[in-house]
């Protein structure tokens, strides 16, 4: 069984008799010498859908649940649901909007590298690629000669995501966004 420091976002863990899907991990180091790092894991209970916070020291052993990942593509939205299709057997997986709301900020019909997380044969979440290409829908006009400065400006994408980009980037530009940090990486 892995230690808390080895658990990543998207892992399924067992805690207090509940199966939890790790949605976010926050690492804090208490003051003082040799203080063990504390891992605060924001999770979703897979049976009730409730949000649960768990805290572990870096050397605590965490029980993981066996899970499978399958490559999928985003198909379409149907009301309050998002439908993803398996790349191999073309089966469809449906998620409620509130279950994948944060992930949908990075997903459009062209997004490649999405994986679905299956626990006991049922779909419990999505794993995004480390970076995605998105087209800027709206940003302030670019300023001539601004490439020498390191100033940034907000850019909005069709999904509703807002990211700080360099001043020389314009509306309609295709850019690469880091999905974990929600930051601009480069032009596509």
Swiss-Prot record:
CDD domains: S1_EF-P_repeat_1 (cd04470), S1_EF-P_repeat_2 (cd05794). SUPFAM superfamilies: Nucleic acid-binding proteins, Translation proteins SH3-like domain. GO terms for molecular function: translation elongation factor activity. This is Elongation factor P-like protein. One of its GO terms (cellular component) is cytoplasm. It comes from Vibrio parahaemolyticus serotype O3:K6 (strain RIMD 2210633). GO terms for biological process: peptide biosynthetic process. It holds the Pfam family EFP_N. Belongs to the elongation factor P family. Signal peptide: none annotated.
């Amino acid at each position: 069984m892995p230690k808390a420091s080895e658990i990543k976002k998207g892992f399924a863990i067992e805690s207090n008799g509940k199966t939890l899907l790790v949605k976010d991990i926050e690492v804090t180091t208490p003051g003082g010498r040799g203080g063990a790092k504390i891992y605060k894991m924001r999770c979703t209970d897979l049976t009730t859908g409730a949000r649960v916070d768990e805290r572990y020291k870096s050397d605590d052993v965490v029980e993981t649940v066996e899970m499978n990942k399958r490559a999928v593509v985003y198909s379409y939205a149907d009301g309050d649901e998002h439908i993803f299709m398996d790349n191999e057997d073309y089966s469809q997986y449906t998620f409620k909007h509130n279950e994948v709301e944060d992930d949908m900020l990075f997903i459009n019909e062209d997004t490649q590298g999405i994986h679905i997380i299956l626990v006991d044969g049922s779909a419990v979440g999505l794993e995004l690629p480390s970076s995605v290409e998105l087209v800027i829908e709206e940003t302030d006009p670019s300023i001539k000669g601004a490439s020498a400065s390191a100033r940034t400006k907000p850019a909005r994408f069709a999904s509703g995501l807002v990211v700080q980009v360099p001043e020389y980037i314009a509306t309609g530009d295709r850019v690469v966004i880091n999905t974990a940090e929600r930051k601009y990486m480069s032009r596509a």
